[in-house]
Swiss-Prot record:
4-hydroxyproline modification, residue list: P30, P33, P36, P42, P54, P57, P63, P67, P70
Note in the entry: Pulmonary surfactant consists of 90% lipid and 10% protein. There are 4 surfactant-associated proteins: 2 collagenous, carbohydrate-binding glycoproteins (SP-A and SP-D) and 2 small hydrophobic proteins (SP-B and SP-C).
GO terms of biological process kind: respiratory gaseous exchange by respiratory system
Protein name: Pulmonary surfactant-associated protein A
Spans annotated as Disordered: 29-102
Subcellular location: Secreted; Secreted, Extracellular space, Extracellular matrix; Secreted, Extracellular space, Surface film
Lineage of the organism: Eukaryota, Metazoa, Chordata, Craniata, Vertebrata
Domain C-type lectin as annotated: residue spans: 132-248
Top-level taxon: Eukaryota
S-S bonds: C155-C246, C224-C238
Biased composition (Pro residues): 54-65
Length: 248
């Protein structure tokens, strides 16, 4: 019985102390706030916001390094005003020789018409024997005797050339004029770079000759050709005075 009373007393004491502890924890006044804690870890990035308005242009930066590649050519502009006339340039180089006149069909047609007109307008001279027509050629003289260069200039001035026979018939026509004036005449032939080789004035090689036996023998010193009253040829220097006979 004593043991029972002691047990009850202990139980009551335990029960009483427990009630007191509970009251101190649950029913006491708030304590002093604690110190702030340290910052936590950064949170995740938020979503992109709405695009803002463009800002004002910034100042021009310094020049870059190497220049860029050239751009494409622009469109052609309007023509400018004509410039002043420049000074006359130096003469150009001599061009290559042209084709001989006898190979130009159009030129031959023109010459044929000229010959026809000459024959019609020079009828009086033809009666005097100063104009002779042979085939497609017309030979004429004014009766004057001058040197080779003067004859060449005279014939060119009237639209012709120094008479140059290319057949026996043409040679005989020239002889008839030479006999009429009882003198010699220069022919339209000149010696080339090689002694003894003669050419027409247009540069074509001679295709008909009637040299006096042993001629030519000037050995490059006699560059021109004269025709005798018998129709034979002789090489001669170009400074002698001979009858001027032109061909058209």
């Amino acid at each position: 019985m004593l043991l029972c009373s002691l047990t009850l007393t202990l139980l009551w004491m335990v029960a009483s102390g427990l009630e007191c502890d509970v009251k101190e924890v649950c029913l006491g006044s708030p304590g002093i706030p604690g110190t702030p804690g340290s910052h936590g870890l950064p949170g995740r990035d938020g979503r992109d916001g709405i695009k803002g308005d463009p800002g004002p242009p910034g100042p021009m930066g310094p020049p870059g390094g190497m220049p860029g590649l050239p751009g494409r050519d622009g469109m052609t502009g309007a023509p400018g005003l004509p410039g002043e006339r420049g000074e006359k340039g130096e003469p150009g180089e001599r061009g290559p020789p042209g084709f001989p006149a006898y190979l130009d069909e159009e030129l031959q047609g023109t010459l044929h018409e000229i010959r026809h007109q000459v024959l019609q307008s020079q009828g009086v001279l033809r009666l005097q024997g100063s104009v002779l027509a042979v085939g497609e050629k017309v030979f004429s003289t004014n009766g004057q005797s001058v040197n080779f260069d003067a004859i060449k200039e005279l014939c060119a001035r009237v639209g012709g050339h120094i008479a140059a026979p290319r057949s026996p018939e043409e040679n005989e026509a020239i002889v008839s004029i030479v006999k009429k004036y009882n003198t010699y005449a220069y022919l339209g032939l000149v010696e080339g770079p090689t002694a003894g080789d003669f050419y027409y004035l247009d540069g074509a090689p001679v295709n008909y000759t009637n040299w006096y036996p042993g001629e030519p023998r000037g050995r490059g010193k006699e560059k021109c050709v004269e025709i005798y009253t018998d129709g034979q040829w002789n090489d001669k220097n170009c400074l002698q005075y001979r009858l001027a006979i032109c061909e058209f």
